[in-house]
């Protein structure tokens, strides 16, 4: 353990020294100018006569203090960035540890051939047995079983995988046997892409960060011109301004605090999202999350728990309970979804015994988001289950009893699945899915931030209305198809609103790509994960709300520290200007702290300028405390804390530092 700590400290120190190189700091104009000032100060100390500055014992000690403090300013800035980069490196290192080279059982021409996982190819058919490592990313094409994904998602509970589900390489099958089709080549797996994304995301600046850097550069240039003007004006009045004093003035006035912490804030944003087991493809995605105006939520899995189960069968008039249970089982025999399996289990409990032999000659009709039904058919028999609207349109059939029953189930928040047998309604299956605990409070927090909520669901109008009212949703879209999500994204963006959404299917890909924040589920399709700009390793749709909170917090952190840094400059101005121009008695009016020793006063300001960076590093890395509220309330609160606080804090701190230096007999 001690050795690990040594390696961590050594690694952070190496990153810190690398970040102090001029070519690296060139991308941060504020800190680059600070480092140039450090080199100039060293040069002045070595060759004072060249610059015509006083070099008595007092001034010599002062120059040393300036050099040390400027070095520490650059060092503390670099170490804050190194700490953030160190966390990102730890994330990529942990992902690399998950990559496992194992033996894979490949099915070729009817035979099973063992090959190493790094020799596999896309579309290879692979057999995985109980307790074996999944050799590569793939899609389940046969069998079912529980897969331990804890090394990727952190979830300790194994996840059930059925036909059509995706599995991730380096996870472990803990039960049964699976046959999968490889969906990636070695080097292009999910984990490989995650490593690439994390490494890439730490290097890119976001648009807001670029804009802020330009603003800080302009501010720095203005203060550089002002400082140079002071040097010229002092010559005009027959005075020689001390260049080291002017350097201290420049460093104290330019926004060194936010300049020092800005890179760390950007990298910390990626790290904070990673702590939620979410991989962001870029800092832009996180930044967009902070500006979201509309959030599109799926009902199942986001508003509700997402595990709909069959709870009751309702036979139509003239059909017995056992007869309808048998029809429900037939319609779900080949349906390997969790809902289909629950229907089959309930039918078995009610005495319906169906085997594969009973269904010889039948063809499976798979469910699709377009048709909204599934079942089986033979030349002489058809059993189909699905949405009421879809079945009525397909079979041109109506039944008042069935329609009333579906409405009653929907009004209590359930999902009604009618079953049609040879063109006539045979009965209704009731599925129930509970609203997630605490979701109403979370939706309320979202609305407090002036964010509009839209729920999309494949359920009918009555169920959608009931669920949206229970959860406090602003707008709902019932009988939703994938194209509806895309249309909502387009509609909201045309209204100049920024949109966030969740998706997991290939049909969600267009909407995910169009949304400003698209969060794909890890258990979703490859197309969805490629279209989205964030991927949730835990496949928890509710995390979209966490992403928005994080985005807001990161933007507020950057804004708060910028406000604090600029407010600091106002205070330091009233400390340093009277100290530099102590020979002009008229300027004593602005010496509101009554600092009588100009050199100690300037040193005190520079000490504060340096140590405030250290105190703000935890805030930059951890983020400013954020409470969901309106923009006006948030602005008012931050101006009070970081604006007024940014003016008052330096006055108090500099005065205390000055008094301590005088008390210790420091007079240079």
From Swiss-Prot:
Annotated residues for binding of Mg(2+): 504, 508
Lineage top rank: taxon: Archaea
Catalytic activity, EC: 7.2.2.6
Chemical reaction(s) catalysed: K(+)(out) + ATP + H2O = K(+)(in) + ADP + phosphate + H(+)
PANTHER family: POTASSIUM-TRANSPORTING ATPASE ATP-BINDING SUBUNIT
UniProt keyword terms in alphabetical order: ATP-binding, Cell membrane, Ion transport, Magnesium, Membrane, Metal-binding, Nucleotide-binding, Phosphoprotein, Potassium, Potassium transport, Translocase, Transmembrane, Transmembrane helix, Transport
Subunit details: The system is composed of three essential subunits: KdpA, KdpB and KdpC.
Protein family: Belongs to the cation transport ATPase (P-type) (TC 3.A.3) family. Type IA subfamily.
Species in which this protein is naturally found: Thermoplasma volcanium (strain ATCC 51530 / DSM 4299 / JCM 9571 / NBRC 15438 / GSS1)
Any coiled-coil regions, as ranges: none
Keyword DNA-binding tagged: no
Membrane topology: Multi-pass membrane protein
Membrane-traversing stretches: 31-51, 62-82, 213-233, 243-263, 573-593, 599-619, 644-664
Family matches, as SUPFAM superfamilies: Calcium ATPase, transduction domain A, Calcium ATPase, transmembrane domain M, HAD-like
GO MF assignments: ATP binding; ATP hydrolysis activity; magnesium ion binding; P-type potassium transmembrane transporter activity
Biological role stated in the UniProt entry: Part of the high-affinity ATP-driven potassium transport (or Kdp) system, which catalyzes the hydrolysis of ATP coupled with the electrogenic transport of potassium into the cytoplasm. This subunit is responsible for energy coupling to the transport system and for the release of the potassium ions to the cytoplasm.
Residues binding ATP, per UniProt: 335, 339, 367-374, 385
Gene (UniProt): kdpB
Subcellular location: Cell membrane
Position of the signal peptide: none
Active site as annotated: 298 (4-aspartylphosphate intermediate)
One cellular-component annotation, GO: plasma membrane
Protein name, as recorded: Potassium-transporting ATPase ATP-binding subunit
Principal location listed in the UniProt entry: membrane
């Amino acid at each position: 353990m001690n050795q690990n700590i040594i390696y961590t400290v050594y690694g952070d120190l190496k990153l810190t020294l690398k970040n102090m190189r001029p070519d690296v700091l060139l991308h941060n104009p504020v800190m680059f100018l600070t480092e140039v000032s450090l080199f100039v100060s060293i040069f002045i100390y070595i060759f004072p006569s060249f610059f015509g500055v006083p070099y008595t014992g007092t001034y010599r000690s002062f120059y040393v203090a300036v050099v040390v403090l400027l070095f520490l300013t650059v060092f503390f800035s670099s170490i804050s960035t190194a700490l953030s980069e160190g966390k990102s490196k730890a994330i990529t290192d942990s992902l690399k540890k998950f990559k496992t080279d194992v033996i894979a059982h490949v099915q070729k021409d009817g035979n099973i051939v063992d090959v190493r996982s790094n020799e596999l190819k896309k579309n290879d058919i692979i057999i995985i047995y109980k307790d074996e490592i999944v050799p590569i990313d793939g899609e389940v094409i046969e069998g079912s079983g529980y897969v331990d994904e804890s090394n990727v998602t952190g979830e300790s509970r194994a996840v059930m995988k059925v036909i059509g589900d995706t599995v991730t390489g380096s996870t472990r099958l803990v039960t049964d046997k699976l046959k999968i089709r490889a969906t990636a080549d070695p080097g292009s797996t999910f984990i490989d892409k995650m490593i690439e994304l994390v490494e890439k995301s730490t290097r890119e600046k976001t648009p807001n960060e670029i804009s802020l850097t330009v603003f800080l550069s302009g501010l720095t240039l203005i203060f550089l011109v002002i400082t140079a003007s002071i040097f010229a004006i002092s010559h005009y009045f027959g005075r020689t301004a001390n260049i080291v004093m002017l350097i201290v003035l420049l460093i104290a006035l330019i926004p060194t605090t936010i300049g020092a912490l800005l890179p760390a804030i950007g990298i910390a944003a990626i790290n904070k999202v990673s702590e939620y087991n979410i991989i962001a493809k870029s800092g832009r995605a996180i930044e967009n999350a902070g500006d979201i105006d509309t959030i599109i939520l799926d009902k199942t899995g986001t508003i509700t728990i997402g595990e709909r189960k069959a709870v009751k069968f309702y036979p139509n008039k003239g059909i017995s309970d056992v007869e309808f249970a048998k029809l429900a089982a037939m319609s779900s025999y080949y349906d390997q979804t969790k809902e289909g399996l629950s229907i089959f289990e309930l039918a078995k409990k009610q005495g319906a015994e169906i085997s594969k032999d009973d269904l010889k000659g039948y063809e499976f009709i798979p469910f699709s988001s377009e048709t909204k039904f599934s079942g089986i058919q033979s030349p002489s028999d058809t059993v189909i289950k699905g949405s009421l609207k879809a079945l009525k349109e397909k079979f041109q059939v109506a039944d008042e009893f069935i329609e009333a029953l579906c409405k009653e189930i929907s009004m209590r928040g359930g999902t009604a699945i009618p079953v049609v047998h040879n063109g006539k309604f045979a009965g209704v299956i009731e599925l129930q899915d509970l609203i997630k605990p605490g979701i109403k409070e979370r939706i309320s927090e979202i609305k407090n931030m002036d964010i509009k909520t839209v729920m999309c669901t494949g359920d009918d109008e009555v169920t959608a209305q009931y669920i949206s009212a229970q959860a406090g949703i602003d707008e709902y879209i019932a009988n939703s198809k994938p194209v509806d999500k895309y249309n909502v994204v387009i509609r909201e963006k045309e209204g100049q609103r920024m949109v966030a959404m969740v998706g997991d299917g290939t049909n969600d890909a267009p909407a995910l790509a169009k949304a400003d924040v698209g969060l794909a589920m890890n258990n979703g399709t490859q197309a969805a994960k490629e279209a989205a700009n964030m991927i949730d390793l835990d496949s928890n749709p509710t995390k979209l709300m966490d992403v928005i909170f994080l985005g807001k917090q990161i933007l507020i952190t950057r804004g708060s520290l910028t406000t604090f840094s600029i407010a600091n400059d106002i205070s330091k101005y009233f400390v340093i200007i009277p100290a530099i121009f102590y020979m002009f008695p008229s300027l004593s009016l602005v010496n509101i702290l009554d600092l009588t020793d100009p050199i100690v006063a300037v040193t005190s300001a520079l000490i504060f300028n340096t140590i405030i960076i250290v105190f703000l590093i935890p805030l930059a890395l951890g983020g400013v405390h954020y409470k969901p509220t309106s923009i006006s309330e948030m602005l008012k609160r931050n101006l009070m804390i970081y604006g007024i606080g940014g003016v008052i804090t330096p006055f108090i701190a500099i005065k205390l530092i000055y008094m301590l230096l005088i008390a210790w007999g420091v007079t240079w």
